[in-house]
């Protein structure tokens, strides 16, 4: 029933290209080689995704141990704090229209850097202070991540209007690669060196994303 309702209710769009599926996939590599703006957007979003995923994939394990001794429900509650990033989408879109997406991407990356780096202060605080810091940091870097993503989409959509879906596919592929790498790296460094190593990894990924956004040209 859901499928039937979608079939009848969703709008119909004419395809913007007559390429067959194999040619569409091959064209992704062509778009990557052709457009430096696409490479910068994909690389910076993918780098930031490493820290984003490293944090969320290790948070529950960290909260389960000392000094918090919290269950998985507490980690799930942190997701509500992270959901605040969804509020950044319309704001980032409006700012990108008014100030330009380049400025918003840099601000988003800088916000993520500050939010990740702030977690290094946790050992100086008591347990409740550490939890407050974690919540504030989660809200901050999620706002930065979502703001960068919306602005990157604005950038890539303006590159070649007839290939927007394919440009978006390249952007999200880079982001998902970063998330997969962040999950693996986060688990590795947490097991070897603990939570502060995850903080260093996340901060480094955000700094790298900011450096890419500060680069000119290619």
Where would I find each of the regions flagged by the language model?
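Helix-loop boundary and gating motifs at the non-cytosolic
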Residues: 49-68, 74
């Amino acid at each position: 029933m859901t499928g039937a309702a979608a079939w009848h209710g969703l709008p119909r769009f004419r395809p913007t290209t007559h390429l067959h599926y194999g040619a569409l996939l091959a064209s992704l590599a062509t778009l990557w080689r052709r457009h430096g703006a696409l490479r910068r957007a994909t690389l910076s979003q993918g780098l930031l995704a490493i820290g984003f995923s490293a944090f969320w994939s290790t948070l529950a394990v960290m909260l389960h141990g000392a000094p918090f001794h919290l269950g998985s429900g507490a980690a799930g509650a942190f997701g509500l704090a992270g959901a605040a990033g969804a509020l950044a989408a319309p704001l980032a879109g409006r700012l990108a229209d008014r100030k330009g997406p380049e400025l918003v991407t840099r601000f988003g990356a800088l916000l993520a850097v500050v939010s990740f780096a702030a977690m290094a202060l946790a050992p100086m605080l008591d347990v409740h202070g550490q939890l407050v810091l974690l919540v504030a940091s989660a809200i901050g870097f999620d706002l930065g991540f979502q703001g960068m993503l919306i602005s990157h989409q604005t950038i890539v959509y303006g590159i070649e209007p007839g290939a927007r879906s394919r440009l978006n596919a390249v952007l999200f592929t880079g982001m998902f690669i970063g998330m997969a790498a962040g999950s693996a790296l986060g688990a590795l460094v947490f097991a070897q060196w603990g939570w502060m190593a995850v903080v260093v990894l996340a901060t480094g990924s955000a700094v790298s994303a900011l450096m890419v956004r500060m680069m000119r040209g290619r």
